Amino acid sequence: MTIIRKKHPLIKIINHSFIDLPAPSNISSWWNFGSLLGLCLIIQILTGLFLAMHYTSDTTTAFSSVAHICRDVNYGWLIRYMHANGASMFFICLFLHVGRGVYYGSYNMIETWNMGIVLLFAVMATAFMGYVLPWGQMSFWGATVITNLLSAIPYIGTTLVEWIWGGFSVDKATLTRFFAFHFILPFIITALVLVHLLFLHETGSNNPTGLNSDADKIPFHPYYTVKDFLGVLILLMAFMILTLFFPDILGDPDNYTPANPLNTPPHIKPEWYFLFAYAILRSIPNKLGGVLALILSILILALMPLLHTSKQRALTFRPITQTMYWILVADLLILTWIGGQPVEYPFIIIGQTASIAYFAIIVIFMPIAGMIENNILDLD
């Protein structure tokens, strides 16, 4: 078996990636989220595939087909709620995975990091299009508002929006193409994940100290396969508790009302995992400025390697930057809360303050904190 594992052209790729892979001996549970994201992707593809067997991407029947899945298809309710809440679990793992990367300075592996940012955009695009498919009120109005943002692009904006819509409003053509893209994107994401792993295995994993771990490596299997399996069990337990006991807690009640272009919901808002970006978008009174801030709120992650001023890689031994980091986390939670609130006093000013703080902490305060720590430790 050892010979096959190491010699067979296909099996040896798996061997070098998941069995004989040299891994740092001290990586903590924060390194579990990569495998958990892989699990989330598999769950989403499988549940999505079974949903697609019963779903119809037509404006007249889309809402009814989702109701039919929940009422008449064997375990259709379970598949539908696993898919909807699977997206939430996916984003929880994504945010923790990115947060880990920022905390431990994993962004210094530039190719892996940039590939991760591309993956983040791809997953966000997929989730947005998936939210449109049930064709409820929030699906329709969310699609209208977000696609309309592209009209802020000078000169080509309006043409671009109508091209994406396939008409003069969000309608049948829009729903059909969103379904097509929502179906294909997860497979593209799977391919991108392999590239992400390819880049990671070029450098090897980072570790909680931020130091080079070449002198102290252990094989991935059995140590981290067992550790990942524990993470999988915990994730699945949390996931099934959410799905079976609180399936609608993260959804919007408006989406149980069929889409009606003549009736606007009082508060149009996206799913919870987009609220922080939505709050940043809304905090700028100018449409184009808002769109740029929205894109930059994610794209700023690509600047992380350039903004790294410290001589140390991780934040493990850097209390000043640690403080900045946790203020940033709190700020993101505030933005998430504000994104779900109506546009009125005092939420407008809180959102604007939190948006400025978000960019200021990343671009100004964390780099300055890094330099201060260098001086304290005399690391010139």
Curated annotation (Swiss-Prot):
Task of the protein: Component of the ubiquinol-cytochrome c reductase complex (complex III or cytochrome b-c1 complex) that is part of the mitochondrial respiratory chain. The b-c1 complex mediates electron transfer from ubiquinol to cytochrome c. Contributes to the generation of a proton gradient across the mitochondrial membrane that is then used for ATP synthesis.
Protein name per the record: Cytochrome b
Annotated GO MF terms: metal ion binding; ubiquinol-cytochrome-c reductase activity
Binding site for heme b b562: 83, 182
Cofactor note: Binds 2 heme b groups non-covalently.
CDD domains: cytochrome_b_C, Cytochrome_b_N
Subunit details: The cytochrome bc1 complex contains 11 subunits: 3 respiratory subunits (MT-CYB, CYC1 and UQCRFS1), 2 core proteins (UQCRC1 and UQCRC2) and 6 low-molecular weight proteins (UQCRH/QCR6, UQCRB/QCR7, UQCRQ/QCR8, UQCR10/QCR9, UQCR11/QCR10 and a cleavage product of UQCRFS1). This cytochrome bc1 complex then forms a dimer.
Family, as annotated: Belongs to the cytochrome b family.
Cofactor: heme b
Database matches in InterPro entries: Cyt_b/b6_C, Cyt_b/b6_C_sf, Cyt_b/b6_N, Cytb/b6-like_sf, Cytochrome_b, Cytochrome_b_C_euk/bac, Cytochrome_b_N_euk/bac, Di-haem_cyt_TM
SUPFAM superfamilies per the UniProt record, alphabetical: a domain/subunit of cytochrome bc1 complex (Ubiquinol-cytochrome c reductase), Transmembrane di-heme cytochromes
Membrane topology per record: Multi-pass membrane protein
Transmembrane segments: 33-53, 77-98, 113-133, 178-198, 226-246, 288-308, 320-340, 347-367
Subcellular location: Mitochondrion inner membrane
Keywords: Electron transport, Heme, Iron, Membrane, Metal-binding, Mitochondrion, Mitochondrion inner membrane, Respiratory chain, Transmembrane, Transmembrane helix, Transport, Ubiquinone
Origin superkingdom: Eukaryota
A Pfam cross-reference name: Cytochrome_B
GO cellular component, one term: respiratory chain complex III
Main localization (coarse): mitochondrion
Annotated GO biological process: mitochondrial electron transport, ubiquinol to cytochrome c
Record-listed heme b b566 binding positions: 97, 196
Chain positions recorded as a ubiquinone binding sites: 201
Note: Heme 1 (or BL or b562) is low-potential and absorbs at about 562 nm, and heme 2 (or BH or b566) is high-potential and absorbs at about 566 nm.
Annotated organism of origin: Microtus canicaudus (Gray-tailed vole)
